[in-house]
Amino acid sequence: MEALQFSSVNRVPCTLSCTGNRRIKAAFSSAFTGGTINSASLSSSRNLSTREIWSWVKSKTVVGHGRYRRSQVRAEMFGQLTGGLEAAWSKLKGEEVLTKDNIAEPMRDIRRALLEADVSLPVVRRFVQSVSDQAVGMGVIRGVKPDQQLVKIVHDELVKLMGGEVSELQFAKSGPTVILLAGLQGVGKTTVCAKLACYLKKQGKSCMLIAGDVYRPAAIDQLVILGEQVGVPVYTAGTDVKPADIAKQGLKEAKKNNVDVVIMDTAGRLQIDKGMMDELKDVKKFLNPTEVLLVVDAMTGQEAAALVTTFNVEIGITGAILTKLDGDSRGGAALSVKEVSGKPIKLVGRGERMEDLEPFYPDRMAGRILGMGDVLSFVEKATEVMRQEDAEDLQKKIMSAKFDFNDFLKQTRAVAKMGSMTRVLGMIPGMGKVSPAQIREAEKNLLVMEAMIEVMTPEERERPELLAESPERRKRIAKDSGKTEQQVSALVAQIFQMRVKMKNLMGVMEGGSIPALSGLEDALKAEQKAPPGTARRKRKADSRKKFVESASSKPGPRGFGSGN
């Protein structure tokens, strides 16, 4: 039975529970790492446990006609670069020390991977030279293999290349903070205005938007609609007013209303021209902005770095916002902007939702490029979608084996709020190699399960035992949801398996230890014990156990958590 496809190791349920400060403690995360995830213990995700578990998962997962899939299709930004870098240090397997000779071929692979990612050629040359010099001069470190040494060097250089430290937005000490957005046409400036306001509202700041794009049809209407969507007022003055005058009037209105942050949208062009720059200079003169941010499309590659340089020379900018980082392009812009222009990337857009704008963390980005995941971002996203009280209640239900369909539905919807499944898995160490086909299948099966749960009565959701004991109830749910009785039986059986698996994993994490792989596999195969009580209760428990075992033996659809 493979009913629950949104799962990890051997169909471990993806259940989310946040406890403590910036901490995830749940079966969802432990299934991938073998223990509790927190910001300190998993700052480095290429640990032995993760690699062992991922190797085991790959050995269990069959894709296609009985064949093991050798390569994965990477659809996210940097996917091509990640694959190229992994190929580079795989050639150091078996080496005992890094030498000029044995790193020559890996360095060629790194150079090729960076160029194919559309990183600027001068940047690639400096990067490769720096990595080579450090690798050859590094002595043998006890317990660390040469390929791991190279990974560490490349990681540190990537962090340095992208700016090193996080560059945060600056705020005015008195009066409203003014942020001026600029950029070429079609990069998403108007949308970024609303996303930035949404981002700042979460920090407790009041915002106002100024519609300064008087050339593009419906640009003002678009900003007004987006402003209503995020709950932020928009100042408009029509299309017959000069942008500089709009800026002056809008700023006056913001001061009158004691607004904390003013964000102004400006017109874009298909190319950089003198008229555009002069107009921006006038707007900047009237606004005297705290931040001048250039909005750059991540898909423009190394041209993005040249664009940032040009705007900085002409009008003077304080940083860049990189949009469409969730696309499938090569992503060289993120690696080139800081090095070429000297200006940092301050924020990045990762999706179409208003919440999909976040700070740019060079160290986290380097980790994702190298396939290490991004545990800290995972923790932050999880804490955003789940309250502390809900997490504690869920943990109690898991430990008492009372996890029900209501909890399952709540958890899957909470995970959905964190973003696409591809994005969530990309944050988890070792899970970046799950293929898009497997993810699509998992998402499809989640919808199937949700449809079946939706037609259950409140009592059936709270007491899965009723469905396990009543074929008539299962038949009714199958009919009402448009699914088969086999699918309903598989889902009901899965909830009992989930109770045992999550309780075992939570118990392991409470003990603070990471079990050996064999121990983890044993925990996943644990059977539910019949509850003590009267003979009648024991017979019902035995009946449910037989139902679970019989349903589990039936084949179901494959997903990335399939053990078939």
Swiss-Prot record:
Annotated GTP binding sites: 183-190, 265-269, 323-326
Catalyses which reaction(s): GTP + H2O = GDP + phosphate + H(+)
Residue span of the annotated presequence: 1-75
Region (Disordered): 460-484, 525-564
Loss of function: phenotype: Pale green with delayed development.
M-domain: annotated segments: 371-564
GO CC terms, sorted: chloroplast; chloroplast stroma; plasma membrane; protein-containing complex; signal recognition particle, endoplasmic reticulum targeting
Keywords: Chloroplast, GTP-binding, Hydrolase, Nucleotide-binding, Plastid, Ribonucleoprotein, RNA-binding, Signal recognition particle, Transit peptide
Alphabetized PANTHER family for the sequence: SIGNAL RECOGNITION PARTICLE 54K PROTEIN SRP54, SIGNAL RECOGNITION PARTICLE SUBUNIT SRP54
Other noteworthy facts: Unlike eukaryotic or prokaryotic signal recognition particle (SRP), the chloroplast SRP from higher plants lacks an SRP-RNA component. It targets both chloroplast-encoded and nucleus-encoded substrates to the thylakoid membrane, post-translationally for the nucleus-encoded proteins and co-translationally for the chloroplast-encoded proteins.
Note on domains (UniProt): The M-domain stimulates the interaction between CPFTSY and the chloroplast signal recognition particle (cpSRP).
Protein name per its UniProtKB record: Signal recognition particle subunit SRP54, chloroplastic
Origin species: Arabidopsis thaliana
Lineage: Eukaryota, Viridiplantae, Streptophyta, Embryophyta, Tracheophyta
